[in-house]
């Protein structure tokens, strides 16, 4: 594409394709050059302005990001997205008051709840937890159709500040008022995992699976927990195997299968799955699992290499 543009520089569609490919490849500096050339040709193009804003944020050029986002708002393009990112830019530059004003201007679209989440976080950090919860209480009254989502934001806030008792009290009340709400049930289950309450995790994940029998995430979460924290390995294997059939490419599920096979003393099969998971998603937890199984299998050199790679 670059060679074609040298031969035919006046090909904006070709240049736009190159810019998109560079962006996707995370070649941000090169992508920004191409989008800037396009911007000079099409100064009001919303896609180009938004891409330049995102690239400016990525490179911490917040002044340019504000310019591009401001133009989007003035030309009535991607307004909620632009307002949300103006809020993020203000937050990143330490202007809390401006961030709150910008986030408050997001009045719809996918970004609305994300903006509300940022407002709640900023209030809790810069004012108080109670002020943040009071803000959410008002929002729930004003937007009853979004009560579940606001309850989830409140749960996430309480979890972040480790208010364990308040968290479970809040989630119990929210789920009682909204019986069968899967996101809230799943969040309470994961909160049970965080605070070593296996009884809560198991009860809520089983309830999720009653409501949504093909919920692969719930199957995997329950199966992995049973494999990791109990000796109910056969039950765990059945759950993880079914989850993996539903999402065969999911690295977390592949890791879970490797871990339960290890618990079942099927070491070679476990290594095969864990190596697949590590190749797709080489994070610390997968590395710890693979390293442990290799070590217990007597393959200590390979285990050390895996741990070293994860640390680097």
What are these language model-derived features?
Residues 2, 25-37, 59-71, 93-102, ...:
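Structural signature of tandem alpha-helical TPR/SEL1-like repeats
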Residues 107-111, 295, 300-312:
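TPR/TPR-like (Sel1-like) alpha-helical repeat modules
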Residues 14, 48, 82, 115-116, ...:
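TPR alpha-solenoid repeat register
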Residues 54, 190, 217, 221-279:
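Alpha-helical adaptor scaffolds
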Residues 17, 51, 85, 118-119, ...:
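Canonical tetratricopeptide repeat
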Residues 7, 41, 74-75, 106-110, ...:
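Structural marker of alpha-solenoid helical repeat scaffolds
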